[in-house]
Structure formats: structure tokens, C-alpha cells
Amino acid sequence: NMLLEYISECSNNGYQVFSHNQAPDGNFVSPTLIELNSIDEINEEKFGPILHVIKYKTDELEQILTALKNKQYGLTMGVHSRIESKADDIINKSIAGNTYINRDIVGAVVGSQPFGGTGLSGTGFKAGGPNYLLQFVDERSITKNTVAFGGNAEILNLED
């Protein structure tokens, strides 16, 4: 399993890995927390119960947000803050398709809350959103010059 290999690789490379009772056959991946030293140490999304944690100083937040944006992955972002203006600032600098503030980042229900990513995480169209079906349509415009047919309504409506 790719996720179990990734978790093992992180542990072998000296990262702090917190996990509980991984199944030996790879059919289940326990929720896992991996503490990274820098945002530069993660280069792709991990679709599984893995939470990466990066400690940073307050004055480094702008650099972190810029680095996240440059990764070009934008599925989901979670922000926990008691300072609403700080949360708003983070949201405005994010490219995430869905952002959750002071709550968990799971539980989007298609039909209730549009869900989808941007950049390398998706097309930007939201499953369950009002414009979702448009991505499957090829829009065409056809214009006929009826005067070229003589403008006669009877001739225009003739069947073969």
C-alpha cells in the first residue's frame, strides 16, 4: 500500500510519526500524524488519513502560505484561529477549493455543499454545485443566414 510505504519511509527518515495499530496486511490505514520540518518536505497530496504538521513562527506565516500556493494543490484547507481577520487573510491567500474554519475538514455532502479542488487537485468545478454539469458539455454556436435561403418561411420549413 502506497500510504503505508510513505508512513514507513517518513519514520525511517527520522520524522516524528504518530500512529496506532497499523494493519499488517495493508487493508486499513490508521489515522497518522507526521511532523515535518518544512513545507518543502511535502510535494503531493496523500489521499488517506494522514495529517502533516509543520511548526512555524508567526512571522513565517506569509512564507508558508506562499509555499502552499506554489505547490499548486488546492483541494481542502482547514484554518483554526480565534482571530477572524487572520483566518480571513489565510483564506484569501489560499487556492483551496474548499476551506473550513474552526471545524473538521471532512463531511462535505454532494448536493448540500459543492466540493472540488483547484490546480493539480481538480478542475475547479464543484461536485454538487450549480455549474458542475457544464464541464461535460461542449458549447457550440450555430448561426444561419435565412436570407440566403430566400427568406421564404415555407421553403425554410420543407422536409427532405
Language model: regions and residue ranges:
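Cytochrome P450 fold signature focused on the C-terminal beta-domain
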Residues: 17-22
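Conserved C-terminal structural/oligomerization subdomain of aldehyde/semialdehyde dehydrogenase
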Residues: 7-8, 12, 24-160
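Short beta-strand to alpha-helix junction loop
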Residues: 1-4
